[in-house]
């Protein structure tokens, strides 16, 4: 929602956005996002929550982690007319690496570097505000992680983000 994105952006920039630090079971958070998105994908698209460690937890803000996942899954659904969207996470040392991988249209090479900027859209026809990835980047960074993308036009896109365990 445009209003929520603008509000979150404003609060992050002013330093007033509050984060709750709690133990978050990542499997339950991902399963909730799976349930939210599985009926929203286009006909001919399969949403898959990959095999993950069902016991893995991080100390973080559950709502903000889910907000990032929701933004990434919504974008994947928007730009995947047919095919698959996989998502999940893996433990890598003392960090957790999340991913959302689609077989969609991909991001043109000249747009990849700007995708996390405000109002960064992959094309002029894309629906949405162009703020979701900016907000996601800021949320991930405020939680001590980082976010990046790999994409090939016509072959799909994979977004990654990391969060520290503790």
Segment roles from a protein language model:
Residues 107-119, 159:
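Short conserved segment of the HATPase_c
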Residues 20-35, 66, 97:
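A conserved beta-strand-to-alpha-helix junction within the catalytic ATP-binding
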Residues 76-77:
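Short helix-loop "hinge" at the ATP-lid/N-box region of the Bergerat-fold HATPase_c
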Residues 132, 136:
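Short alpha-helical Gxxx[C/S/T] motif in the catalytic ATP-binding
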Residues 10-21:
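Helix-loop junction within the histidine kinase core
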Residues 1-9, 29:
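Coiled-coil phosphoacceptor/dimerization helix of two-component systems
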């Amino acid at each position: 929602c445009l209003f929520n994105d603008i509000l979150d952006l404003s609060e992050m920039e002013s330093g007033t956005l509050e984060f709750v630090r709690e133990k978050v079971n990542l499997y339950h958070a991902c399963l909730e996002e799976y349930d939210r998105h599985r009926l929203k994908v286009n006909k001919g698209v399969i949403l898959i929550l990959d095999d993950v460690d069902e016991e893995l937890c991080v100390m973080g803000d559950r709502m903000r982690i889910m907000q990032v996942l929701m933004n990434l899954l919504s974008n994947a659904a928007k730009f995947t007319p047919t095919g698959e969207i996989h998502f999940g996470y893996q433990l890598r040392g003392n960090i957790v690496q999340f991913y959302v991988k689609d077989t969609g249209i991909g991001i043109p090479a000249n747009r990849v570097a700007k995708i996390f900027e405000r109002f960064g859209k992959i094309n002029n026809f894309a629906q949405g505000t162009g703020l979701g990835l900016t907000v996601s980047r800021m949320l991930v960074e405020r939680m001590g992680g980082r976010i990046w993308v790999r994409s090939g036009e016509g072959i799909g896109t994979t977004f990654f983000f990391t969060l520290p365990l503790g």
